[in-house]
């Protein structure tokens, strides 16, 4: 996504209109030029890359567009790492300790570097050169990190990502959002709801799979203390929504007026005909590494119980519940498993409230011992579900023991 200073939009009354680039020859040429620059910058430093990007921007009026495209290439397609033969913090500690005993000068600095290299050569039992000490001294600073990998997108894919990011930026200042997910393939609903669960969005849900759902989401500016992190979470939902066939969205915004400096109301609307392209995979998503790890371990376990990912939606007042897994025995017995991992207190309260309202007697809750349920206002004794406690990993053995009780 894009930072606030690279978001571009215009206002049509109260309606906000994000900047969207056309896939024309000029725009694609700019995208291709930037991609080529990143490809040629591989194995160089971030600082060198940034200087080349600044030179490419020049004094042209479209510098913010170029900067936005470059930001996406940097954050989504590039991998930077500290490359140093020696540990930079250790080198600085040694060099600074010796330098403090001397009068600063170019000669003294070189002598200090040589002295540290000699000390390390003796300690490590192999030769350490002064050039290695110099190279490693500040190798961990961002500008000195090395571009070790660049997964080049096509120019078209980069422009699509830019257009999506401009629209996502609208939701940083959302106070209220309503999504109408019209009648769709049930699998699309499930994927959308799983992403909502993943991003821990505070949502009121009405409807059913036969007629569609209306989702009301509180935005980051509606919270008692506006949260940038929560605004980013809402923005991350949009690529998931694009996988739903028929939908519409309306949002109320808190916009900063650049002339008066005051905040005023704004509106934004978009639907499934918007032409935006998602970069999220259309298939199943795991809500956490906990779930993915549990699946891997279950597949290696020796048991008749079969673990299934596809679980029906459980309607409850004002929401739906999507258990993480169904466990099925050949004799017909079934249980639903919900993993309760590392969630915010308000989300924990909502989750346990959902369990109480579900009216299910076949539910297993796998609860992390790291959670402070009492502080979150949750009394687990009031929860009508079988409980499995876990620390870092959820083990199939613990779940199977509960199943056989």
Residue ranges and their predicted role:
Residues 1-405:
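Electrostatic, structured charged patches in enzyme active sites and in nucleic-acid/phosphate-binding
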């Amino acid at each position: 996504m894009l930072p606030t200073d690279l978001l571009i939009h215009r206002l049509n009354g109260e309606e906000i209109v994000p900047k969207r680039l056309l896939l024309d020859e000029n725009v694609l040429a700019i995208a291709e030029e930037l991609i080529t620059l990143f490809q040629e910058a591989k194995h160089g430093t971030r600082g060198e890359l940034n200087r080349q990007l600044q030179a490419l921007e020049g004094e042209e009026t479209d510098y913010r567009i170029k900067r936005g495209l470059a930001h996406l290439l940097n954050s989504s397609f590039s991998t930077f790492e500290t490359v140093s033969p020696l540990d930079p913090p250790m080198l600085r500690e040694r060099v600074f300790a010796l330098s403090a005993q001397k009068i600063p000068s170019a000669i003294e600095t070189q002598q200090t570097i040589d002295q540290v290299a000699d000390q390390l050569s003796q300690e490590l039992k192999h030769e350490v050169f002064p050039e290695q000490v110099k190279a490693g001294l500040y190798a961990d600073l961002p500008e000195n990190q090395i571009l070790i990998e660049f997964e080049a997108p096509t120019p078209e894919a980069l422009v699509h990502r830019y257009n999506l990011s401009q629209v996502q930026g609208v939701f940083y200042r959302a106070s209220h959002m309503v999504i109408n997910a019209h009648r769709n393939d049930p699998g699309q609903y499930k994927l959308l709801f799983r992403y909502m669960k993943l991003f821990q969005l505070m949502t009121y849900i009405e409807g059913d799979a036969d007629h569609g759902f209306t989702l009301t989401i509180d935005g980051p500016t509606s919270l008692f203390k506006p949260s940038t992190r929560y605004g980013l979470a809402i923005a991350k939902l949009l690529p998931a929504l694009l996988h739903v066939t028929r939908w519409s969205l309306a949002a109320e915004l808190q916009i900063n007026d650049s002339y008066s400096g005051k905040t005023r109301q704004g509106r934004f609307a978009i639907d499934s005909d918007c032409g935006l392209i998602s970069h999220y995979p259309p298939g199943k998503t795991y809500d956490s590494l906990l779930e993915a790890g549990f699946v891997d371990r279950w597949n290696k376990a020796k048991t008749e119980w079969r673990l299934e990912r596809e679980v029906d939606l459980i309607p409850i007042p004002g929401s739906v519940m999507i258990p993480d897994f169904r466990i099925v025995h050949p004799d017909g017995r079934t249980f639903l498993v919900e993993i309760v991992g590392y969630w915010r207190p308000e989300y924990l309260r909502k989750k346990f409230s959902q369990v109480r309202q579900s009216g299910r007697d076949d539910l297993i809750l796998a609860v992390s011992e790291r959670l402070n349920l009492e502080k979150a206002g949750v009394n687990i004794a009031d929860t009508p579900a079988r409980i499995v406690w876990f620390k870092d990993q959820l083990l199939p053995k613990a779940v199977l023991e509960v199943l056989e009780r």
